[in-house]
């Protein structure tokens, strides 16, 4: 669905009116397109932590141009499209001043749609209390910058565990690219990869890999299938038998296979096991299928409660368990679930949905350590307001509020969720597990 306000304030007349009366002026986000340069350019590298050499290696591999950082003594107005600050060596409160000085001197140099990444050491990996406090303080800085910089600029914090330096590349590539246009203010933890350092074709990272996507006949599920196929995957598109016609169209559009399966059926696990026995194991499984049955809990029927939990939570749990126990996932496999901002913040009239999506977060956090023994990662995305057929049915004023209540002042697109899932499912993302990444433009809900 089109965003009329976004189009209006970016027209010549609308821009003048918005400036005159002080209306928000969000910029249309620049998203990745095939054939475009992968990373922002040029990018400032600053900080002197243990990750600086790895960042420079990644920049060299991606032809990213490093730019000179401005300082308080040597200011500069030359525009840049990104900044990476390695704060992994910050060990006390005094050293936090280095971040103030850097961002104070360089914030105005960041161009529209720029990407900012701060690298740190997670507090649980710090050597003492002063270091742990200083590293935890980075979260407040990053979330504040994400709200202050505006102009479609995004800001993230990546905590990299000691020894996990080689796990950084896929995450840094993602957060410095247009693929992460609607992800901002996020904190991601990297540990040592569960499956080593595989050889990667960065143009077609899923080449030779098989992916299963549920709820794939339309909307976000279709976008996920399209992005995975674009990046080389053979995609099995799953949806309920009632959606067979649109499912077959979706599968055909990505050169994949349509499989009509009710994931809540009593024999769904047996059907999955039979499919794997006939066709082979998967490398990527995306639990996207979900439903809503909105009512306040006082008015909600038992059937509405149970059906939402069955589709959104029970089915992903049962299918994931069957895949892990029954050799349905290859080593180096990826499970990605779809949670929601509602699962983090709750929502009026969605107690069933919020319960199910909070449960998905519990599934990810609980299953990740178990899956690691099989060299499999488990993660989730938590979308905010995404422009879909479902959100198009929301009453106008509520829909507009949902669009504007984030730092980017607009709704996301299904491809924003799909690109984030593709990063989590990436063969080089073995160091990312047990994480829940919001795709919400830094929504005020649950902040």
Kindly give the residue locations of the regions a language model identified.
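Short, small/polar-rich loop/turn modules that mediate ligand/substrate recognition or access, typified
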Residues: 151-154, 182-185, 332, 372, ...
């Amino acid at each position: 669905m089109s965003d009329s306000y976004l189009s209006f304030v970016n027209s010549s007349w609308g821009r003048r009116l918005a400036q005159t009366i002080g209306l928000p002026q969000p910029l249309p986000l620049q998203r990745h397109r095939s054939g475009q340069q992968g990373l922002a350019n040029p990018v400032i590298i600053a900080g002197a932590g243990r990750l600086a050499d790895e960042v420079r290696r990644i920049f060299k591999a991606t032809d990213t141009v490093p730019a000179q950082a401005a300082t308080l003594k040597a200011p500069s107005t030359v525009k840049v499209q990104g900044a990476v600050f390695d704060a992994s060596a910050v060990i006390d409160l005094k050293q936090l001043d280095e971040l103030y000085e850097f961002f104070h001197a360089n914030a105005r140099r960041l161009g529209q749609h720029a990407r900012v990444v701060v690298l740190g050491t997670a507090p649980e990996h710090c050597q003492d209390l002063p270091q742990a406090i200083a590293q935890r303080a980075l979260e407040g800085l990053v979330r504040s910058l994400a709200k202050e910089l505006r102009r479609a600029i995004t800001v993230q914090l990546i905590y990299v565990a000691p020894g996990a330096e080689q796990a950084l590349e896929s995450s840094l590539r993602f957060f410095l690219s247009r693929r992460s246009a609607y992800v901002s203010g996020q904190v991601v933890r990297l540990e040592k990869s569960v499956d080593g350092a595989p050889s990667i074709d960065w143009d077609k990272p899923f080449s030779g890999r098989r992916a299963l996507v549920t709820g794939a006949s339309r909307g976000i599920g279709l976008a996920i299938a399209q992005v995975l196929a674009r990046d080389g995957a053979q995609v099995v598109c799953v949806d309920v038998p009632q959606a067979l016609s649109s499912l077959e169209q979706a599968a055909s559009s990505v050169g994949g296979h349509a499989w009509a399966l009710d994931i809540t059926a009593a024999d769904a696990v047996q059907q999955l096991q039979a499919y794997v026995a006939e066709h082979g194991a998967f490398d990527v499984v995306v639990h996207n299928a979900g439903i809503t049955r909105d009512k306040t809990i006082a008015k909600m029927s038992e059937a509405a409660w149970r059906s939402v939990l069955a589709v959104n939570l029970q089915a992903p749990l049962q299918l994931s368990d069957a895949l892990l126990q029954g050799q349905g996932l290859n080593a180096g496999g990826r499970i990605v679930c779809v949670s929601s901002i509602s699962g983090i913040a709750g929502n009026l009239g969605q107690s069933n949905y919020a319960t199910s999506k909070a449960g998905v977060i519990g599934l990810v956090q609980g299953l990740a350590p178990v899956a690691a023994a099989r060299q499999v990662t488990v993660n989730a995305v938590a979308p905010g307001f995404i422009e879909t057929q479902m959100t198009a049915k929301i009453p106008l004023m509520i829909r507009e509020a949902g669009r504007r209540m984030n730092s980017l002042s607009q709704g996301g697109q299904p491809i924003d969720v799909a690109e984030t899932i593709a990063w989590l499912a990436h063969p080089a993302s073995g160091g990312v597990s047990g994480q829940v990444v919001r795709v919400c433009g830094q929504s005020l809900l649950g902040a």
